[in-house]
Amino acid sequence: MGIRLQSSDSMNNQHQTQQNKYFNVSNQASTRSLWSQQQQQQLLDTKGSASTSKSPMLMANNNVFSIGPYRQRKDAGRVSVLEKYEIIGYIAAGTYGKVYKAKAKETQEEQENSIHTHNQTLGSVSVAGIDGGMASREVENGGDDPLRLDGHGGIAVAPAAGGGLSSAAAHRARSNGAVKALPKKSAFTPFYAIKKFKTEREGVEQLHYTGISQSACREMSLCRELDNKHLTKLVEIFLERKSIYMVSEFAEHDLLQIIHFHSHPEKRLIAPRMLKSIMWQILDGVSYLHQNWILHRDLKPANIMVTVDGCVKIGDLGLARKFYNLVQTLYTGDKVVVTIWYRAPELLLGARHYSPAIDLWAVGCIFAELIGLRPIFKGEEAKMDSKKSVPFQGNQLQRILEVLGTPTHHTWPNIHKYPEYEQLSKFSKYRDNLSVWYHSSGGRDKAALSLLYSLLKYDPITRIDAIDALEHEYFTNNDPPVSSDVFEGLSYKYPPRRIHTSDNDIMNVGANKNKSGFNHHPPQQQTVNNNGVTNSSIGGLGVNRRILAAAAAAAAAVQVNGTNIVSGSSSSNGPIRKKKR
């Protein structure tokens, strides 16, 4: 009986196995049929699309390579510099461009927000008690000033339109000395300095756009990365009509203006505390640059700005560059750096490579000029010849020798390694007269003279650096102490920066906006040349349209001249005037 049951079980297993094989085979067959149907459908779709579509383009159209539509779309959405800023006047011009004073234009949304905020401020009062609590009450529309906490446990009062306080609580707060008047928003209008880089050469506009100068690229890239209290802060950059506009914070004064104020019409020395505060802030900014591996290479009084609140800021980074991990010498990139009166002696002797010590020499020259109110080394610059070779600045070196004396191998061990070392033998021997110059200029502080000697050392290796200069006795003796406001304690005010309103060529940007490609629908002008090819089709390949237009105009002028000569020979109106090409 057991044997029979076992055989029946085996028969059942065999039957189940046969069923599984059958189902697997059927599943595979159905999968193959579905796959074949999908392939056939894809082939039919491909044939149908091929029959309905156009023939493939063998050669791409010129518009494929043109960036014109992209540029037009970007230009249409770009905000103009004159749409965002109101130009007040022209400040000055430099080697690389012009600088203008401007202020930001308020948008409609900002005006509505300011009005809403002003109304909210006039409608509430917050009084802070001595125990730190605060009680709020509404003020009636009677000219009362709103009160609020000033963040230090006191009460801040905003002046109302009427002018005075009628609230008894506000009067008591003022009598206790715990009330501070809130400044009006209109009294602190932020101003900006807009630097427009030059795009013309000798006043004549170039036919072909040459691109962005190396100086502009360096200044923009460095200003984007740097962030220090004693460096002018970059706000934004505009690229408009192939011109670059750098918008920076505005400073009302500079050291050149301050020196001129103290030296004209009569000489009045700068206050000792102001002098020390200016020098400390300059060295703090230079220290920040050098710690970030950046050389300024153009430090001078005109590039040292002072804001209305007495903060010194280093500006004009047009010649600045990084000196970390250099591939070639610094001389290879820029053969002439630093204004001649502030140029270090190693540069005058033809150094092919130099260090941050050149900036410290320039700081020493600025320090001496603030003391004596005139440049300490005022030499005459030798101009370059037609071969563009860098001349030896002998007159400037002589001015340095007359004050600091002739350097020796003891004071400057590596002086014989400089290319222009042999030029020193042509000068007379001078002795050190810096202390004589210092006392004759009105200097009395021995620590200041010691710092001046450290900054004006001949040997760049032993010349003091910015970090050590900040720890010098001149700053640490606190007699007088250094102030974050260089104008603190002064009984007089410096005149504001002179602004010229007659020279505002930046205003032409807005006048010619529709002609410069910033309009939403620029007209498509096509000029046919002699070969029958339009400029628009050639322009798609990147050819300058202005060059093509100039060539077409020249060809038309030649044809006109030829007809005038033929017709003029038969007429008796007078001699023929030849037109200049």
Curated annotation (Swiss-Prot):
Q: Which GO terms describe its molecular function?
A: ATP binding; cyclin-dependent protein serine/threonine kinase activity; metal ion binding; protein serine kinase activity; RNA polymerase II CTD heptapeptide repeat kinase activity
One GO BP annotation here? Answer: nuclear-transcribed mRNA catabolic process, non-stop decay
Keywords in alphabetical order? Activator, ATP-binding, Kinase, Magnesium, Metal-binding, Nucleotide-binding, Nucleus, Repressor, Serine/threonine-protein kinase, Transcription, Transcription regulation, Transferase
Q: Where in the cell is it found?
A: Nucleus
Q: Which residues bind ATP?
A: I91, A92, A93, G94, T95, Y96, G97, K98, V99, K195
Start and end residues of each stretch annotated as Disordered: 34-57
Query: Which reaction is catalysed here?
Result: L-seryl-[protein] + ATP = O-phospho-L-seryl-[protein] + ADP + H(+); L-threonyl-[protein] + ATP = O-phospho-L-threonyl-[protein] + ADP + H(+); [DNA-directed RNA polymerase] + ATP = phospho-[DNA-directed RNA polymerase] + ADP + H(+)
Biased composition regions of type Polar residues, renumbered to the chain: 48-57
Instruction: Name all Protein kinase domain ranges.
Output: 85-475
Name what cofactor the protein needs: Mg(2+)
Reported function: Component of the SRB8-11 complex. The SRB8-11 complex is a regulatory module of the Mediator complex which is itself involved in regulation of basal and activated RNA polymerase II-dependent transcription. The SRB8-11 complex may be involved in the transcriptional repression of a subset of genes regulated by Mediator. It may inhibit the association of the Mediator complex with RNA polymerase II to form the holoenzyme complex. The SRB8-11 complex phosphorylates the C-terminal domain (CTD) of the largest subunit of RNA polymerase II.
Describe the subunit structure: Component of the SRB8-11 complex, a regulatory module of the Mediator complex.
Give the protein name, as stated in the record.
Serine/threonine-protein kinase SSN3
Give the organism, scientific name.
Answer: Eremothecium gossypii (strain ATCC 10895 / CBS 109.51 / FGSC 9923 / NRRL Y-1056) (Yeast)
